[in-house]
Each structure stands twice: as structure tokens, then as C-alpha cells.
Curated annotation (Swiss-Prot):
GO terms for cellular component: cytoplasm. This is Elongation factor G. Its main location: cytoplasm. Keywords: Cytoplasm, Elongation factor, GTP-binding, Nucleotide-binding, Protein biosynthesis. GO terms for biological process: ribosome disassembly. GTP binds at residues 17-24, 81-85, 135-138. It is found in: Cytoplasm. Catalyzes the GTP-dependent ribosomal translocation step during translation elongation. During this step, the ribosome changes from the pre-translocational (PRE) to the post-translocational (POST) state as the newly formed A-site-bound peptidyl-tRNA and P-site-bound deacylated tRNA move to the P and E sites, respectively. Catalyzes the coordinated movement of the two tRNA molecules, the mRNA and conformational changes in the ribosome. SMART domains: EFG_C (SM00838), EFG_IV (SM00889). GO terms for molecular function: GTP binding; GTPase activity; translation elongation factor activity. CDD domains: EF-G, EFG_III, EFG_mtEFG1_IV, EFG_mtEFG_C, EFG_mtEFG_II. It comes from Campylobacter fetus subsp. fetus (strain 82-40). HAMAP family: EF_G_EF_2_B (MF_00054_B).
Length: 691
């Protein structure tokens, strides 16, 4: 079977945005105009085809990235929906891995929001070429040119409008296409799909010429031949302009800007044309790199001919077909009924049915080709971030890094009968979401779930009830504290037991030093002349690592410590790995007590947007929560306060903020860094932990 859509006509794109910029509506309209969904789903009435999990319908926020295939001008567009809420940045990160290009949607009123900055940073990290769609041009306070300024100043990017709006707010009629120099006008609101091409209104001609000149200059900079033409005063043809925009977009030196209002169906078809014209095909972006089993690096080119290599980027439980694993094929082809090798787990997987998802319908297919995205039914051992490969070349594609959770709660089922069901439910949810962890508290035997924020865990508990029919009681949220040391110390420890028969003997000298925040643990072997034999060194490191699990102040994990083993002694008969492990572990604990151990707490970056009259209350409240105010700005007539606040003080913040501001303020919060806890708070934490 040969492929229906040539590789150069495939587009893998994501729609990325802040929570209320209208991302789902934009995705919906794309599906509508590409002829996939006939009735337009509205987020307001909870029927959007992209948002296919029930809670999303209720909360009106998009949680899981569903990959949906649609067609426009003979191009296959695989649309990967990314969530905009900060607790789900892991989802965004995961979808950025498999995208070739992105459409960043901004609200014409709200502009660049804190969440947009996070998503933008992730897109930069994975070098994803993108364009901007300024949405909600019909809203009161809409201003396309303000958003352009904010993208320059806040995101430090180079936005180049290739359209400008005709009017704004209720007067928003359409857009001026600066490439063709024509006005595209939506005249009849009852027929949203039809627009007319007209001459540019006289009062906007000067502005259009000014912005076209800026665009041409940006285009000329992408190519020497175009630059010569430009400086020679020659006109660039439409083809040359388009070629230049694409080159700038792929090199990420310019970001084409378009506008419209997805809700009112204005500006969506030109956006689709731009996706096809300017965003890259799989073979136009840098090839993904992988490593072989011997550690050597290989480049995995996008081609149908090589051996199969693909990345599992998302796992979902589907009520009808069971577990779905979403796979992006980078090289070769994946056929249903064949076998693939999971190179991360070292296991062979049988490929069952292959599905292509159309927002909420599934189409069964026989083959997935390079550059395509689909879902595999029935994989047993494959998790998010695993590589699937052919039999010959066991390549591992770039691994994904997932952050450690910062918040935990204890959960128990309402009825004892649900205990086993809850275990299965949590295990399945943890398979789908690597930033969610499940563990058991050794002392109390309680099940502990951990994640990236309160909303994250609320949704997990909610999904247990909806999808697995398990009702759970949730305990008080617990903060993931850490411990570290402040000064360097040297510590000797001798572990010796002689009581008839064979004894135990291990003797170590350790140097403990604090490291920069975020460095983790480092172990250095500095033994000279074999005073501690080589075979016992790993046991010393292991002993230190075990001691790190539970700190000396309150039993929290210890981090950012360097341990050097610099001296010691051993006994020909009585020394053993066990003895050295115990000596190191106890030596580490004694040393840590002298090294000024302190407790660290997760600090959240909090941004509150509030009407001016509540500004004083908001700041006063953040100060009460031990917040450090960073900056105060203005956006769309509101005040913006940015602060770092300890997570421990932020539980229930949304309710308090609502009552302080009569529901008129909004906030976003994401983990930023760990910081030392003040002494009085530290004493309380220790007292609570040690009873």
C-alpha cells in the first residue's frame, strides 16, 4: 500500500494557548471548516469534539491532548490539542515533542498571559516553529497591535503581521491580507463560512501599506537573493513573499501573525491556508536524534523507506476499545498485525489494531507512515515517552523529562470493597500521566497520590469516580518538603561488631558539602592507596543514597549535597559491603546534623490579575501568605501582581481570592523553585512530623 498523502503535504501541528484565549473553539472551527464535524461544538454548552473527557465539558478547559486528523487543500493536518491550564504543563511538554509546528492563540483583550509564557518557553525548548492567531477580535477591548507589542516585549519574539484587522470589537468585519493586498470581509453573520474579497477600505490603506512594508523587510532578511531585490527597489512577487515567510517561520526568526474570531467563524479559513503555506512538513524540521544500545548517536530521518521508529507520546483509556497508545511515526511504517520492539523496556510488542482519530470518531487503518500520528490498541508494556522500533536497529529516541510532583494527598476508598478497584484505577491513571505518582505511606499504610498542583489531583479523584466508579475520601494536601545542608563538614564513622565468629567492620571518612540548588546528589571517590578496597566503594555510595531518602530534621528527602569519601580502613576478614553501607549511612546522618541541616519548601510563581480597587487586599493577602512580591504591571485595565509564594500557604487560595474580589480576579500558579523555610515555620514542621 502506498501513502495517500505525500510526506511534504503532512502537517503535525498543535494549538497552544492560555486557558481562555479560545483554543478549543479555534480547534473546533478548524475541524468544522475542514469538513470533519458538521455541527460546530461550542465550549460554552460543553459539546466540543476535541474535549472528549467529561470533566473537560464541565470545566470548559482542555485536559488531554487528543490527536485528530483532518484535511485541507489536499494536505493532511494532524491536530494535537494541548491543554492551557498550568497544572497540565506536562501535557503541553509531551505534545511539543511530537509537533512540527504550532499555532499560538492569544486573546485580543488579554494578550500575553503568564501561561502563554510557559507554553512559549516549552515551544522554544523543543524548537517548534510557530505562528500567532489573535482571537476574540470582536470582544470589548480587543487590540491586535497591543498583542503584537506584548509578544515583542514579554516573549522576546519577532512577530510579523501578515494580516491586519478591519475594525475591532462589534465593528470587527474581517482582515486585510497584506500579501495579496486585499480585504477579506465576512458580511453575513448567518453564513459564517462565506467571505468576500474586496478592495482595501480607503481609511485603512495607509496602515496596510505601512504594515506591508514591515512584512516585506522581514521577508527580505530571510534570503540573500530577496534582500538584493528589496534593496534594488524591485517588487517581490507573491510567491517570493510566501517563500520568505516560510523560511523565516522555519528558522524561528519571525512569527507570522493573523487574527480573527473563531467563535464567530471569522478568519479561520485564512488561518488554515497559512498552516498549509508556512508551517513545516515532517521532512522540513531538524531530524530527531536517537541513540543505539551501544550509546552511539544516530539521526532518524523522516522517510518511509528506513526501518520503523516511533515515539509513544500519550496513553488514554478508551471506554470502547480499552487502552490506546498514541504514536508518532518518525521513520519507516507501522503496520497492524506486525511486531515492534520497545527499546526502553526491552520488550517485544504486538501491534493490534491501528486507529486514526477524527475528534470523536475512529477510523481503522492498516498502516501508519513516516510523519503520521495514530493510536495503537492493545500494547502491554509501552508507557508515555517510550520508543517503538523495528527488529534490526534498536534505537531509543530522545527521552522525555518529567518533573517531580510538588503536592501529595492521602486517598482512601469510601467502602472497603473499593480498595482493589481504587488500586487498579490509580495504576491506570499513573500509566497515562507520568507527572502523577502513586505510593504507599509505610507508617500509616495509606495510599498517597502526588501531582503538579491542586487542580491536577482534583481531576484525578474526579476521574476515579467517573471512569472507574470509585468514590474516594481525600485527606489534607501535603507539601513535598526537602532537606539540605548549609555548610561543609568532615565526618568519621566506624561500624564494628565483633561478637564471636565473623564480625562486621567498615570505617569511612566522609566530606559533606552543599551544592547549588537543583543539583541533586553527587558522590566522589577520593581514596588513595586502597585504604578502602575498590569493591566496597559502591556500597559506600549506596549507604549515602539510602541516608538521603530520609533527612535528619524531619525525615524529608535530602538534596543538593556532595559527598566525598576521602579516607577509611578495612579488616581482611570482617569487612563486607553491608558493613561499609551501614558505616556510610550512619556517617552521613551524623555529618548532616553538624552541617546546618535546613528544610526547603516548594515556591510557586503566582500571578494575580485583579481590578485596581482590590489591589491592596490582594497584596496584603499574599504578604500574609509569606509571599514575595516581584512585580506589578497593567494589562487591559487590570492590575497584574507577580509573586513567589510557598505552596504550603496557597491551599484554598482560589476560594479566598474569589471572596476578596467578588470573583473578579483570576490567578495562575506554577512550581518555580525550592527555598529555605524560615526558622519559626521550620520548627513547626519538625514538631508536626516528629509528633
Amino acid at each position: 500500500m502506498s501513502r495517500k498523502t505525500p510526506l511534504n503535504m503532512v502537517r503535525n501541528i498543535g494549538i497552544a494557548a492560555h486557558i481562555d484565549a479560545g483554543k478549543t473553539t479555534t480547534s473546533e472551527r478548524i475541524l468544522f471548516f475542514t469538513g470533519m464535524s458538521h455541527k460546530i461544538g461550542e465550549v460554552h454548552d460543553g459539546a466540543a469534539t476535541m474535549d472528549w473527557m467529561e470533566q473537560e465539558k464541565e470545566r470548559g478547559i482542555t485536559i488531554t491532548s487528543a490527536a485528530t486528523t483532518c484535511f485541507w487543500k489536499d494536505h493532511q493536518i494532524n491536530l494535537i490539542d494541548t491543554p492551557g491550564h498550568v497544572d497540565f504543563t506536562i501535557e503541553v511538554e509531551r505534545s511539543m515533542r511530537v509537533l512540527d509546528g504550532a499555532v499560538a492563540v492569544f486573546c485580543a483583550v488579554g494578550g500575553v498571559q503568564p501561561q502563554s509564557e510557559t507554553v512559549w518557553r516549552q515551544a522554544n525548548k523543543y524548537r517548534v516553529p510557530r505562528m500567532v492567531f489573535v482571537n476574540k477580535m470582536d470582544r470589548v477591548g480587543a487590540n491586535f497591535f497591543n498583542v503584537e507589542e506584548q509578544i515583542k516585549n514579554r516573549l522576546k519574539a519577532n512577530p510579523v503581521p501578515i494580516q491586519i484587522p478591519i475594525g475591532a470589537e462589534d465593528e470587527f468585519k474581517g482582515v486585510i491580507d497584506l500579501i495579496e493586498m486585499k480585504a477579506l470581509v465576512w458580511e453575513d453573520d448567518t453564513k459564517p463560512t462565506d467571505y468576500v474579497t474586496k478592495d482595501i477600505p480607503a481609511e485603512l490603506l495607509e496602515k496596510a501599506q505601512e504594515y506591508r512594508a514591515k512584512m516585506i523587510e522581514a521577508v527580505a532578511e530571510t534570503d540573500d537573493a530577496l534582500m538584493e531585490k528589496f534593496f534594488g527597489g524591485e517588487e517581490l512577487s507573491v510567491e517570493e513573499i510566501k517563500r520568505g515567510i516560510k523560511a523565516g517561520c522555519l528558522a524561528m526568526t519571525m512569527i507570522p501573525m493573523l487574527c480573527g474570531t473563531a467563535f464567530k467563524n471569522k478568519g479561520v479559513q485564512p488561518l488554515l491556508n497559512a498552516v498549509v503555506d508556512y508551517l513545516p512538513a515532517p521532512d522540513e524540521v531538524a531530524a530527531i536524534r536517537g541513540e543505539l544500545e551501544d550509546g552511539s548517536e544516530v539521526v532518524v530521518d523522516s522517510t518511509d523507506n528506513g526501518e520503523f521508529a516511533g515515539l509513544a507520546f500519550k496513553i488514554m483509556t478508551d471506554p470502547f476499545v480499552g487502552q490506546l497508545t498514541f504514536v508518532r511515526v518518525y521513520r519507516g511504517q507501522l503496520e497492524s498485525g506486525s511486531y515492534a520492539y520497545n527499546t526502553v523496556k526491552g520488550k517485544k510488542e504486538r501491534i493490534g489494531r491501528l486507529l486514526r482519530m477524527h475528534s470523536n470518531k475512529r477510523e481503522e487503518i492498516k498502516v501508519l507512515y513516516a510523519g503520521e500520528i495514530g493510536a495503537v490498541v492493545g500494547l502491554k508494556d509501552t508507557l508515555t515517552g517510550d520508543t517503538l522500533a523495528g527488529e534490526k536497529e534498536h534505537v531509543i529516541l530522545e527521552k522525555m523529562d518529567f518533573p517531580d510532583p510538588v503536592i501529595s494527598v492521602a486517598v482512601e476508598p469510601k467502602t472497603k470493597a473499593d480498595q482493589e478497584k481504587m488500586g487498579i484505577a490509580l495504576q491506570k491513571l499513573a500509566q497515562e500521566d507520568p507527572s502523577f505518582r502513586v505510593s504507599t505511606d509505610e507508617e500509616s499504610g495509606q495510599t498517597i497520590i502526588s501531582g503538579m498542583g491542586e487542580l491536577h489531583l482534583e481531576i484525578i479523584v474526579d476521574r476515579m469516580l467517573r471512569e472507574f466508579k470509585v468514590e474516594a475520601e481525600v485527606g489534607q494536601p501535603q507539601v513535598a518538603y526537602r532537606e539540605t545542608i548549609k555548610k561543609s563538614v568532615e565526618q568519621e564513622y566506624k561500624y564494628a561488631k565483633q561478637s564471636g565468629g565473623r564480625g562486621q567492620y567498615g570505617h569511612v571518612f566522609l566530606r559533606l558539602e552543599p551544592l547549588e540548588p537543583g543539583s541533586g546528589f553527587e558522590f566522589v571517590n577520593d581514596i588513595k592507596g586502597g585504604v578502602v578496597p575498590r569493591e566496597y566503594i559502591p556500597a559506600v555510595e549506596k549507604g549515602c543514597q539510602e541516608a538521603l531518602q530520609s533527612g535528619v530534621l524531619a525525615g524529608y528527602p535530602v538534596e543538593d549535597v556532595k559527598v566525598t569519601l576521602f579516607d577509611g580502613s578495612y579488616h581482611e576478614v570482617d569487612s563486607s559491603e553491608m558493613a561499609f553501607k551501614l558505616a556510610a549511612s550512619m556517617g552521613f546522618k551524623e555529618g548532616a546534623r553538624k552541617a546546618g541541616a535546613v528544610i526547603l519548601e516548594p515556591m510557586m510563581k503566582v500571578e494575580v490579575e485583579t481590578p485596581e480597587e482590590y489591589m491592596g487586599d490582594v497584596i496584603g493577602d499574599l504578604n500574609k501568605r509569606r509571599g514575595q512580591i516581584n512585580s506589578m504591571d497593567e494589562r487591559a485595565g487590570n492590575k497584574i501582581v507577580t509573586a513567589f509564594c510557598p505552596l504550603a500557604e496557597m491551599f484554598g487560595y482560589s476560594t479566598d481570592l474569589r471572596s476578596q474580589t467578588q470573583g473578579r480576579a483570576t490567578y495562575s500558579m506554577e512550581f518555580d523553585h525550592y527555598e529555605e523555610v524560615p526558622k519559626n515555620v521550620s520548627e513547626e514542621i519538625i514538631k508536626k512530623r516528629n509528633g
